[in-house]
């Protein structure tokens, strides 16, 4: 059975991370009137919500595992460092750079055709990520053999 504490922690992590990303982006941009950014954050909210529902119904034990600590005892040390760097650069710093560029520099203004392409690729990536999580009940942030869950 899924531990409620870890389930709540998983949901909280997802949505607090999204809120932090939005705050970083809009603070760096210096403005809130950016329709494409709002579309992205709303779609990401919908993605987080629907993926949680799908995972909770199909692989509740995965929610329990992902709601716990990202750093398990058996996690590889090198992978812990990769996760820290990825979290900083991939989850937070990119929103600062994108917001700063859009609000102050506008170095690379992209047309609507790029928005459609980006949206399509974003949706494809969502489907692939959720599919991988459903197919692999051992899907965790770091590399480790989960002996406690009989992974071989």
Which residues are covered by each model-predicted region?
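Membrane-anchoring alpha-helices and their flanking helix-loop junctions
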Residues: 1-152
């Amino acid at each position: 059975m899924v531990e409620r504490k870890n389930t709540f922690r998983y949901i909280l992590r997802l949505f607090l991370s999204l809120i932090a990303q939005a705050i970083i982006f809009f603070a760096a941009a210096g403005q809130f009137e950016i329709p494409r950014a709002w579309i992205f954050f709303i779609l990401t909210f919908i993605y987080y919500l629907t993926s949680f529902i799908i995972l909770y119904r199909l692989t509740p034990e995965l929610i329990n595992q992902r709601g716990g600590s990202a750093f398990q005892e058996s996690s590889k040390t090198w992978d812990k460092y990769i996760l820290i760097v990825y979290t900083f650069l991939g989850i937070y710093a990119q929103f600062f750079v994108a917001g700063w560029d859009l609000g102050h520099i506008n170095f690379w203004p992209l047309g609507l055709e790029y928005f459609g392409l980006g949206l399509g690729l974003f949706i494809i990536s969502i489907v692939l990520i959720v599919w991988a999580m459903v197919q692999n009940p051992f899907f965790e942030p770091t590399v480790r053999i989960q002996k406690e869950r009989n992974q071989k």
